[in-house]
């Protein structure tokens, strides 16, 4: 299932060290990264957590991210979280962007510059210092996963062909452990994430398709298991079926096929029509996103109405 060109990973894992819900301005740092990813069209976005973090799920529930639970719940290292995210996205995207949650202040323009640069591993640099996020191709994922040394992510990337991109963005280095620095960058970062916020839905007499249901169908197609799809999307089992049943009533055909029983406990998968619907919606969403970004840039950024 290679539906998108760029997938994203945000490593949270060690909640105490990472501080994903640290408020900088009016929003938590993890929300800043999700917004930045979404502005350049990253999907799916995978958040790697170290346990059942209900507060985090509530914070991100409306943003359509995938929650992956790390097996080593207590004190996973950064590389462990990277590995979990890469294992999930391998084969699903042509490129993957990664950032630890405690580096939240890089801008959408910086990320777009990295994505516009060809290279197996693309790393931003500010005044000679490398930072985050890091972009790598799907072909590099097996090499990162195969690393077994003691130097973590740095060691895994050390022998890979890296392309450095100079950026005028100190946010690639700003760390949540230095809250004063985050706050110094706040005004500039808030300006960088000004964007047209389209919360797309399909409606009939009432809304019947949203970002949450899009993600749920994506995960059903990926896992063929409703409970796993619900756990990874942060949607309750009963709510998931309510949304699917409403969608099927409005469309007039089955979107999800239920197979009960058997040694495996049954499975859930998209019907051919359901898969076609999801693919068409994603293509539609991409086209609307690109059009909106272009119009916003033309009417507000290039005219310097917003600077």
Predicted regions and their residues:
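N-terminal glycine-rich phosphate-binding loop and ensuing alpha1 helix
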Residues: 2-54
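Conserved beta-loop-beta/alpha segment of the NTase-like Rossmann-fold superfamily
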Residues: 71-142
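Conserved alpha/beta core of the MobA/IspD/sugar-nucleotide pyrophosphorylase nucleotidyltransferase superfamily
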Residues: 148-197
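Short helix-boundary/capping micro-motifs
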Residues: 223-229
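Key DNA-contact positions within bacterial/archaeal DNA-binding proteins
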Residues: 227, 238-239
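Residues within the DNA-recognition helix of helix-turn-helix
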Residues: 243
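A short LG(V/I)-centered, amphipathic sequence patch enriched
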Residues: 249-269
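Helix-turn-helix/homeodomain-like alpha-helical modules used for DNA recognition
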Residues: 275-307
